C-alpha cells in the first residue's frame, strides 16, 4: 500500500487488497517449481493496466534467472519497472535484530526531536482513491497442482475443464502415485482469475479430485 502511494500517488485501501499467505505451501510445490525452473516467493505486486490498478500479495513462482528469485534470509527486495528506466532492483536487509533496531531507534530519535518535517517525496495532500481493477479481472500465467485418482480420463477431464474457460496449458507434469493420489501439475498460458476459479470450481465437483487444487501465479 505504501509503495503504491509513492509510485502512483493514489490510495489503495488495505482491506480491498487480495492477500494470500504461504499456509498451504507444500514442499511438493517447491520441488515442482524448481523442476520448471522457478522458485516460490511471497510477493506483493502492483501494476497499472488500462488506467486501473491491479495489486495483491500472493505466493508466486519466480523465474530462477530473476534477481528476486535469489533473495533470501533476512533480506528484502523491491523491483520497479518504468517506461524509460526499464527494470530497477533494490536489495537490502529488511529483518533481523540490527536492521529492526536501527529503524526503531531512528523513529524514536525523530519523535524525541519533534521532527515534523515530511520525508522527501511524501505527498502531503489527501490522496485520491485508486481506480482498482476487480481482482477477478486480473490476468496471470498459473502453476496448478491437482491430487487425483489414478483413473483413465482424469487428464482429459482436467484439461477439458480449463479449456471450457479458455485456459490453455503450456506444460504438464505427472509423477508417480502416492497414498495421497497422483500429483498432476499444469503451467498455463496467461488467463484471468475468473477463468481459473470457474475451472477449479468445476473440478471440485468431480469425484477424481482428492484434495483442493493448488494455484499460484507465475512471474517470468
Place the predicted regions along the sequence by residue.
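A generic structural motif
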Residues: 45-47, 81-83, 147
Amino acid at each position: 500500500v505504501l509503495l503504491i502511494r509513492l509510485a502512483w500517488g493514489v490510495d489503495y485501501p488495505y482491506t480491498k487488497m487480495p492477500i494470500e499467505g504461504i499456509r498451504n505451501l507444500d514442499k511438493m510445490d517447491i520441488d515442482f517449481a524448481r523442476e520448471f525452473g522457478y522458485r516460490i516467493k511471497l510477493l506483493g505486486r502492483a501494476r497499472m493496466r488500462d488506467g486501473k490498478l491491479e495489486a495483491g500479495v500472493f505466493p508466486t513462482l519466480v523465474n530462477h534467472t530473476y534477481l528476486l528469485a535469489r533473495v533470501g534470509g533476512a533480506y528484502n527486495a523491491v523491483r520497479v519497472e518504468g517506461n524509460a528506466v526499464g527494470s530497477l532492483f533494490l536489495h537490502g536487509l529488511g529483518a533481523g535484530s540490527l536492521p529492526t533496531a536501527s529503524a526503531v531507534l531512528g523513529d524514536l530519535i525523530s519523535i524525541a526531536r519533534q521532527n515534523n518535517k515530511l520525508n522527501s517525496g511524501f505527498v502531503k495532500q489527501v490522496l485520491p482513491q485508486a481506480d482498482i481493477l476487480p481482482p477477478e479481472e486480473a490476468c496471470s500465467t498459473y502453476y496448478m497442482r491437482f491430487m487425483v485418482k489414478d483413473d483413465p480420463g482424469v487428464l482429459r477431464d482436467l484439461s477439458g475443464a480449463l479449456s471450457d474457460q479458455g485456459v490453455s496449458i503450456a506444460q504438464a507434469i505427472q509423477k508417480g502415485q502416492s497414498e495421497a493420489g497422483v500429483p498432476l501439475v499444469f503451467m498455463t498460458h496467461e488467463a484471468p482469475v475468473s477463468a481459473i476459479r470457474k475451472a477449479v470450481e468445476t473440478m471440485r465437483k468431480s469425484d477424481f479430485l482428492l484434495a483442493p487444487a493448488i494455484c499460484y501465479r507465475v512471474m517470468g
